From Swiss-Prot:
Annotated gene: CERK
Tissue specificity comment: Highly expressed in leaves and at lower levels in stems.
Keywords noted in UniProt: ATP-binding, Calcium, Kinase, Magnesium, Metal-binding, Nucleotide-binding, Transferase
Residues given in the record as ATP binding sites: H145, P146, L147, C148, G149, T176, G205, D206, G207, L208, F209, N210, E211, S320
Polar residues: compositionally biased ranges: 276-286
Name recorded for this polypeptide: Ceramide kinase
Catalysed reactions, semicolon-separated: an N-acylsphing-4-enine + ATP = an N-acylsphing-4-enine 1-phosphate + ADP + H(+)
Cofactor(s) it depends on: Ca(2+); Mg(2+)
Position of the signal peptide: none
Mutagenesis / variant outcome for changing C458A: 36% reduction of activity
Length: 607
């Protein structure tokens, strides 16, 4: 089997010599006189390749005795030698069209041999090789949203479920019955039970993924609240805040307001290094722990915490926008996402921690923690989601309708924003005094930075996933300096919207996303402050998002700050935030980015 290879018949090609290497197997025509017809057959079947990598093979199985077709040509048709009955086995792999980006396509290679034992030997050997791919999941918890998008959740799962079954991946499927179902399940799940799974999959949109994310992190992410500027006042008694938060966790009952907004709280002990790289935090590596039902050290089971080197999240897109999937895979395709999960692809993903201090100006200080994977937005972004709740019967079209209604109101909001400035960060670093008179006083940088787009095997994301110091040397574009005391910069006035993009947020309406050069795992937020401006100017700004290659952030009323943390204060009574499409009522929040806090079943976008 090794070395020179063995003669087999390949369906649609003919007799070939198959050789096994360290990373895959390859085949060549056995007879030179028929090589041209073999390869012309492969050319006519673009899904076939002459080499199969084990990293792309997700299953192999024996078939019943049946026909193995020779390559099609006129002579074979005349002679009637198209099909030959023999023992067979099939290799299930993936292929990609040569034009990129493009979806992944399942592909079958059917091999035949006269001897049944030879086929069995090949099957067992290939199984042994693909089982060495250690990153592949064995057991997954799957949440299916039956009503997301246009009701595609259940249908999409029915489409991809056979792929998981064929790959021998066990799945525990839960069809959600109500809002907060996934959150409640994961927040209440014991670590002992969670350790039975290699990951959690959302068959739905960004909202379901956000619910799963918050359910997992609410009691399993240990870190402090975001840093706040001097004068914000809520960290004067930090231990009291943390104690209040821990008490909330021990009760773990949802208030009515919290249930409406993806319920949850987070257990985070005091830590004086809130911007510490998450890769240096102490999290449990599930792959190195005992996954049996037997408890360790008496009755205690090792805690599951995040960041976590093994546990991963995944999305099979079925929502209205699917911005997270498009930003992390480049394809809004359920089959592609399913194959990425089955093959165990992995990337790290930044997560924004959002702490609501007050729900309204008259409310008492009561810190509540939420997490967002793609975007946190106020003003226009929040009002669109709130307005759309009235028109759920319209389906995905409600977002266009609500967006138009909110846009025509052209409402602005008085607010103050403070963000951490880093020395090399490209931003409009105007002071609060300079901004007091409005747009005209902003100092706009005409020479905008060179965009470095995040993609598969992104060097910036790979570099920042190791250590902060190394990332600085390896990635000059990561906009990080070794400043020990980052400076807080205030910006205040009337804003149409305030948004923080964790990732690019690509979607079908915005092909480049909100921030084209946002990275998946560089530890930064992209703070977007849209100041009050005439309605036609705002329309011009919004339409730029729909054009690939445009620069919607180049307007003078737009501030773009790349930062690790920011604080927001508003005096508006009904202030609402949009967190990955979910509502959170809050007039005072602080937000920070956690680098690579979770791992995703994805490989990055091909752009």
């Amino acid at each position: 089997m090794e070395g020179g290879g063995e003669a087999l018949f390949l369906d649609g090609v003919g007799e070939v010599t198959v050789a096994v290497g360290d990373d895959g197997l390859s085949f060549q025509p056995l007879h030179q006189e028929v090589s041209s017809s073999c390869w012309s057959s492969i050319i006519m079947q673009p899904k076939l390749e002459s080499k199969l990598k084990f990293s792309d093979v997700y299953a192999v199985e024996l078939l019943e005795v049946g026909p193995v077709c020779e390559p099609w040509n006129a002579r074979a048709t005349v002679q009637g030698k198209i099909n030959t009955e023999m023992n067979r086995f099939v290799i299930h792999t993936v292929t990609r069209p040569r034009k990129r980006p493009s979806p992944w396509v399942p592909c079958e290679y059917i091999f035949g041999h006269k001897d049944q034992q030879t086929c069995k030997t090949w099957v067992e050997h290939i199984k042994t090789c693909i089982n060495k791919e250690q990153d592949r999941p064995k057991s997954l918890m799957v949440f299916v949203h039956p009503l997301c998008g246009k009701g595609r959740g259940c249908k999409n799962w029915e489409t991809v479920a056979p792929l998981f079954e064929r790959a021998k991946v066990k799945t525990k499927v839960i069809v959600t019955q109500r809002a907060g179902h996934a959150y409640d399940t994961l927040a209440s799940l014991s670590d002992k039970d969670l350790k039975k799974f290699d990951g959690v999959i959302a068959v739905g949109g960004d909202g379901l993924f956000n619910e799963i994310l918050n359910g997992l992190l609410s009691t399993r992410h240990t870190n402090s609240y975001p840093p706040t500027p001097e004068g914000f006042g809520y960290f004067r008694n930090n231990m009291k805040c943390q104690e209040h938060r821990n008490n909330d966790l021990s009760n773990s009952e949802l208030t009515g307001d919290d249930a409406n907004a993806i319920s949850g709280s987070s257990n985070t002990p005091d830590d004086h290094e809130p911007l510490l790289s998450t890769t240096r935090s102490t999290g449990l590596d599930i792959s190195s722990s005992d996954s049996s039902d037997e408890p360790c050290n008496g009755d205690q089971v090792p805690l599951v915490s995040f960041p976590n080197n093994w546990f991963r999240l995944g999305i099979i897109p079925s929502g209205s926008t699917d911005a997270i999937v498009l930003s992390t895979t480049g394809e809004r395709d359920p089959v592609t996402s399913a194959l990425l999960i089955i093959l165990g692809r992995r990337i790290s993903l930044d997560i924004a921690q959002v702490v609501r201090w007050k729900s309204s100006p008259s409310a008492e200080v009561s810190p509540t923690v939420r997490y967002a994977a793609s975007f946190a937005g106020y003003g226009f972004y929040g009002e669109v989601i709130r307005e759309s709740e009235k028109y759920r019967w319209m389906g995905p079209a409600r977002y266009d309708f609500s967006g138009t209604m909110v846009f025509l109101k052209h409402r602005s909001y008085e607010a103050k924003v403070a963000f951490l400035e880093n020395g090399n960060t490209h931003s409009l670093t105007a002071s609060a005094e300079n901004n007091a008179n409005g747009v005209q006083t902003l100092q706009y940088h005409q020479n905008r930075h060179r965009k470095t787009i995040c993609r598969t095997n992104c060097l910036i994301c790979k570099g920042t996933s190791t250590s902060e110091q190394n990332s600085e040397d390896e990635n000059p574009d990561s906009s990080r300096t070794a400043c020990e005391t980052p400076k807080w910069v205030w910006s205040k006035g009337r804003f149409l919207s305030v948004g923080a993009a964790v990732i690019s947020c690509r979607n079908e309406r915005a092909p480049d996303g909100l921030v084209a050069d946002a990275h998946l795992s560089d530890g930064f937020l992209h703070l977007l402050l849209i100041r009050d401006c005439p309605l036609p100017f705002y329309l011009w700004h919004l339409t730029q998002f729909t054009k690939k290659g445009s620069d919607p952030l180049s307007f003078k009323f737009v501030e773009h700050h790349k930062t690790q943390a920011f604080t927001f204060i508003s005096s508006h009574d009904e202030s609402v935030w949009n967190l990955d499409g979910e509502l959170l009522q809050a007039c005072e929040v602080s937000v920070q980015a956690f680098r690579g806090l979770v791992n995703l079943f994805a490989s990055g976008p091909e752009v």
